[in-house]
Amino acid sequence: MGSIDEVKKESAGETLGRLLKGEIKDEELKKLIKFQFEKRLQWGYKSSHQEQLSFNLDFIKSLKKMEMSGEIETMNKETYELPSEFLEAVFGKTVKQSMCYFTHESATIDEAEEAAHELYCERAQIKDGQTVLDIGCGQGGLVLYIAQKYKNCHVTGLTNSKAQVNYLLKQAEKLGLTNVDAILADVTQYESDKTYDRLLMIEAIEHMKNLQLFMKKLSTWMTKESLLFVDHVCHKTFAHFFEAVDEDDWYSGFIFPPGCATILAANSLLYFQDDVSVVDHWVVNGMHMARSVDIWRKALDKNMEAAKEILLPGLGGSHETVNGVVTHIRTFCMGGYEQFSMNNGDEWMVAQLLFKKK
């Protein structure tokens, strides 16, 4: 019996109310989340290949009519603007908030973070002496990794979060790195005549909408010899916005505010080659992501009291608000596990593509 048969009918508001009051135990929460993803699969899979192709192409065409990005400011406030001490208590040593890559069963989160950084460098063909731009760099773990490994590279991180810029520059100073820069900007608004040998975008393109315009913008920062490496979460067959699939979907809007996240199909970016052309294309099994978020949740649970104390001052001393933030993060992690472990990691996964300028 699947989750769809096991979940009792209640409104999205009722489910969220119980969740925020702490009335839903983890086992029930797993079933409730899995139910939502099973509904998403029913929504996304079509009965014939022609129907599937038409459905997918309609989505691609719809993106081309939209603004370049989604509601990034809303998402930043609700998802990414957390104290660095909190992030350090939950994530690994490079504070990587995206898929980690587990090369063996006993790999630690620190080893998996490093392996992911190494995989990016290998597939992006990073070489010493290059100029590198990491777009949506987060806390700067990849920037610092490249700057340390390739001493003659000049590595720049771009983010619209002041806290992330400050964290990155502080870590670079601690490490004695002089080949690191940070740009505080919204990538969709940022203009520059500068070009880079390598552009990297790790799990950030999900927050874009009009990918035709966005890829054109990225191409202006490339020369004929440059390469663009994009890593994004995806579904293997169809794309979808991370928004409610029906009126009873409590999960999607709770995890990301509406308009903030687009889950592409594994091949979606192949339809946006007006200004760049694909050089290589890979997928990474979803179990790497599932294992990552599961480790983050366990670290949060282990450090729960300390984590709440870290959050309290920045949230107005409100224990209720702190509990809400923690519930959101735990639910995000549990949801990520259910999503990316479906079909043994062969349903939702991570796509990686390498492009050159046309």
Curated annotation (Swiss-Prot):
Entry's EC annotation: 2.1.1.122
Enzyme active site: 333
Keyword Cytoplasm listed: yes
Thermal activity profile: Optimum temperature is 37 degrees Celsius.
Biological processes per GO annotation: methylation
Inducing stimuli: Up-regulated by fungal elicitor.
Free-text activity regulation comment from the record: Inhibited by nickel, cobalt, calcium and magnesium.
Gene Ontology molecular functions: (S)-tetrahydroprotoberberine N-methyltransferase activity
Record's keyword terms, sorted: Cytoplasm, Methyltransferase, S-adenosyl-L-methionine, Transferase
Alphabetical list of Gene3D superfamilies matching this protein: Vaccinia Virus protein VP39 (3.40.50.150)
SUPFAM superfamilies, alphabetized: S-adenosyl-L-methionine-dependent methyltransferases
Highest taxon of source: Eukaryota
Known tissue expression: Expressed in roots, leaves, stems and flower buds.
Presence of the UniProt keyword Transcription in the record: no
Reactions catalysed according to its record: (S)-canadine + S-adenosyl-L-methionine = (S)-cis-N-methylcanadine + S-adenosyl-L-homocysteine; (S)-stylopine + S-adenosyl-L-methionine = (S)-cis-N-methylstylopine + S-adenosyl-L-homocysteine; (S)-tetrahydropalmatine + S-adenosyl-L-methionine = (S)-cis-N-methyltetrahydropalmatine + S-adenosyl-L-homocysteine
GO cellular component: cytoplasm
Pathway: Alkaloid biosynthesis
Summary of pH dependence: Optimum pH is 7.5.
Binding site for S-adenosyl-L-methionine: 98, 136, 160, 164, 186-187, 202
Location in or out of the cell: Cytoplasm
Family per similarity comment: Belongs to the CFA/CMAS family.
Known partners and oligomeric status: Homodimer.
Function text: Involved in the biosynthesis of protopine and benzophenanthridine alkaloids. Catalyzes the conversion of the protoberberine alkaloids stylopine, canadine, and tetrahydropalmatine to their corresponding N-methylated derivatives. No activity with dimethoxytetrahydroisoquinoline, methylisoquinolinediol, norlaudanosoline, (R,S)-tetrahydroxyberbine, (S)-scoulerine or (R,S)-pavine as substrates.
Protein name according to UniProt: (S)-tetrahydroprotoberberine N-methyltransferase
